[in-house]
Structure formats: C-alpha cells, structure tokens
C-alpha cells in the first residue's frame, strides 16, 4: 500500500475514532478489525487502482469458517460496500469527507458488538433473513444456532489460534469461551 496523503488521512482519523473503541489496524493496511470472539467486524477503507481515495466496506468475518484470510462473510445490509468512492482532491476535502466514513464505521462496529450475545445474534439473523430472502449467506446465519456445539467451538478456537499467531493480529482480545 502506498503511504500517500489519502492513506495517512485515513489512518489518522481511524487512530482518533476507531482505535479508542478497541478496534485495531491489521498491520499497516487499510483494514481494521474489531474482535468479538466468534467473529471479527472487518472495516476496510478500500483503495482504487484508478484514483487516490477510498470506498468503505464493513462486514463480519465468522471464525468458524477456518479461513487463512480475512473475508467479508456477512454485511449489515445487502452488500459489504457501505459507502461509494471518495476521490482524493486535496487534504482538506478528503479529511472532511472521510471522517464521515470513519464515523459510519464506528457506528457499525458498535452495532455488531451487540451480536456477541447469542440471543441477540439469533434474533438479528432471523430478521435479516426475512428481509434478504434467498441470500447465499443463510448457511452462515444458521451456524449461529449451533454456536456452542463442540465442532463449531473447535473450529473457532483453531481459527483464533491461527490469527493470534500472526504479528499483524497481536491486539486480539482474549475470550474464555473461544480461546484455547
């Protein structure tokens, strides 16, 4: 990732707004993680190959999937893309627009934290499924119903152990239920 002015502005705003919430930056990327035990809330300030600037993507990454990469498994709405592209024109303009994206990301992080409670997660998943019928993410949501099954817990613990071994993820929280 180029360390250009747009990236520096994003990082500073995230440092001011997201990091105090306990969200951490994955390495030096534009990816920010909120560790919620069985899932990460993933906030991405996605660059474009065509112009300096950013999109905002936010979604959950479920740890029972045992992936060795961060994926966007479950969005707040129908898509992971929360906000369209802001093109960098100058520092003042970009900071003024990006702060709204960082504030939106912080609101979604706080919302998703409510899903740490399994009853809340199940209720939300049911409402989400009714709203977005025939969505391919139905299997992800059905797994919430089996969150305390031994096999699901084993997968979560194994995946958390994998991510904890990565230097870029050393700020993960500890959870008695989900850590080895």
Briefly describe each language-model feature range.
Residues 3-25:
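Amphipathic alpha-helical segments
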């Amino acid at each position: 990732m180029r360390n250009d002015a747009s990236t520096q502005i994003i990082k500073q705003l995230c440092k001011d707004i997201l990091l105090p919430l306990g969200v951490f930056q994955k390495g030096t990327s534009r990816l920010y993680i909120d560790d919620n035990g069985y899932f990460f809330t993933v906030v991405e300030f996605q660059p474009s190959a065509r112009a300096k600037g950013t999109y905002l993507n936010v979604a959950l990454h479920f740890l029972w999937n045992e992936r060795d990469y961060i994926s966007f498994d479950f969005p707040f709405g129908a898509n992971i893309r929360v906000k369209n592209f802001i093109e960098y024109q100058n520092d003042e303009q970009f900071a003024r627009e990006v702060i709204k994206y960082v504030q939106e990301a912080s609101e979604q992080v706080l919302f998703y934290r409510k899903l740490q409670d399994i009853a809340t997660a199940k209720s939300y998943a049911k409402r989400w499924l009714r709203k977005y019928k025939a969505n391919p993410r139905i299997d992800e949501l059905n797994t919430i119903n089996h969150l305390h099954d031994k096999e699901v817990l084993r997968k979560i613990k194994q995946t958390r152990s994998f991510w904890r071994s990565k230097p870029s993820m050393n700020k993960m929280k500890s959870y008695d239920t989900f850590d080895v």
